[in-house]
Structures are given as C-alpha cells and as structure tokens.
Amino acid sequence: MGIRKHKPTTPGRRGSSVSDFAEITRSEPEKSLLRPLHGRGGRNAHGKITTRHKGGGHKRAYRLIDFRRNDKDGVPAKVAHIEYDPNRSARIALLHYADGEKRYIIAPNNVRQGDRIESGARADIKPGNNLPLRNIPTGTVVHAIELRPGGGAKIARSAGARVQLVAKDGPYAQLRMPSGEIRNVDARCRATVGEVGNSEHANINWGKAGRMRWKGKRPTVRGVVMNPVDHPHGGGEGKTSGGRHPVNPKGKPEGRTRRNKPSDKLIVRRRRTGKKR
C-alpha cells in the first residue's frame, strides 16, 4: 500500500492524503458474504444516546469475516482477491477453498492474489496460515489471536497490527502486544501468522472534518462550553473551568480511577503508560 498526497487546490485538500488502493484487485464484494448494516447513530433500543459522536456517514454493507477458521483445517485455499472493507482499517482477502466454499479473512501483509493458504495444527509457518499458538515457533509475529480457544480472533485485527510470540510456559503462551504489554494466553488459542496489511493507514491525513463525517464520526464538544441543561460542566458567566472535578455527561467521575479486570492475573508486564506508579 502507498499513500497519495493531494494537491492544495482547496483548504480542505491542503495537506490531506488518501490510500492509493494499489493492492486492491476487485471493486465489487462477494454477494453471498454481504449482510445489511443499519446505522444506530449511537442509540440503544430505547432511542437514548449510549455512545456519543456517532451518526451519519456513508451507507455500508457488512462483510462476513471468518475469525475462527477452525472448521477448515486441512482444506487448502487460494487467495482469489484482495478487497476494500469500509467497516475496518485492514483490507480483506477472499479465499476460495478446495471444497468450493468462499470466505473472507483479514488480509495479512505480503499475501497476494493467487497465494495458497491453509489452517490447522500442521500448517506451514507462513503469512496467512492459521494454527494454534502452541504449534507456532517462539519469536514469530502473529495477528488475529483468540482470547479463548474456539472463541474467534479478538486481538490484533486492525491495519498494521502485529503481536510477537515471546515465550511458552506450560498451558500458556506469552504475547508482546503493540502497546508493550506482555500477557499470557491459552496456548490452544489460534492465531494467524504474519502482521495485518495496510500498515500505512496510520499515516493518512484526513484533511477536513467532512471526511470524518463520511465515516460516521460526529464532532466532540467539550462540556464546559455547553449549557447547564446539557452537561454538568456547562454554564457560568464567561469562560469557566467547570467548577468541579471532571465528570461525564451523566455526572459520573472521569479520569483517574481503578479499572481492574478479571484478566489482570494473566498480564505479565504492564503496557507503557509514561506515568509514575
């Protein structure tokens, strides 16, 4: 993938850039793998906003992605196409299996149209192949990793994501995350060899707010510039600081707090935060 910079013909185009889509081999998706996707605008079933800054955006169709790949062990597949997916930053690869079935997967880096891919414990260690962590050599870079055996890939699915398998200790495999965190994962969990493609996505300059609106992202407004009816920090004469400790729109404290999770016992080393503990 490469990035194409726009000429400064307008203020919105100045400095902006876009992917050149050089790796895309097909413009139309596989119809049998499409499902309708209805925009919720950040609302729940009662019509209340549960996630702010969402709404609008271009109409999309959801592409069904195979995040498990455990029912195709031993069945070879050929990469038929590399396609664009509006629902994620990574590209997707359309696989044609030897038994006639077609499926989408996250497109790994350096996987091209016509390549052969397989899954299973005996699969070769090459980009795109999917196998359990206990069958992958230490030091290998992987992506699309399960957190529970058979649960489907949850970790490292976005563009350019890469996780390194640093050690194996009994029933666990130790993974170094992009954040620098090292954590234990069940060695029976599956992962795909290689890193996710489209790594230049992070370097795209979106240029103007309108391009964010096309993606369904609405503006983020600070609470201190709202009215009292809209936010606990709102109101006051002139420019104010909010007059209280930071809270969210519902009045619950924001910022420093404890957010321990049940999986903390599996974390070997914390991620780099830059904070003194």
Swiss-Prot record:
SMART domains: Ribosomal_L2, Ribosomal_L2_C. The keyword Metal-binding does not apply. Residues 23-33, 251-267 have a biased composition (Basic and acidic residues). One of its GO terms (biological process) is cytoplasmic translation. GO terms for molecular function: rRNA binding; structural constituent of ribosome; transferase activity. Transmembrane segments: none annotated. Keywords: Ribonucleoprotein, Ribosomal protein, RNA-binding, rRNA-binding. One of its GO terms (cellular component) is large ribosomal subunit. Residues 1-58, 223-277 are annotated as: Disordered. Residues 37-58, 268-277 have a biased composition (Basic residues). NCBIfam families: rplB_bact (TIGR01171). Belongs to the universal ribosomal protein uL2 family. One of the primary rRNA binding proteins. Required for association of the 30S and 50S subunits to form the 70S ribosome, for tRNA binding and peptide bond formation. It has been suggested to have peptidyltransferase activity; this is somewhat controversial. Makes several contacts with the 16S rRNA in the 70S ribosome. Part of the 50S ribosomal subunit. Forms a bridge to the 30S subunit in the 70S ribosome. This is Large ribosomal subunit protein uL2. It comes from Saccharopolyspora erythraea (strain ATCC 11635 / DSM 40517 / JCM 4748 / NBRC 13426 / NCIMB 8594 / NRRL 2338). The gene is rplB.
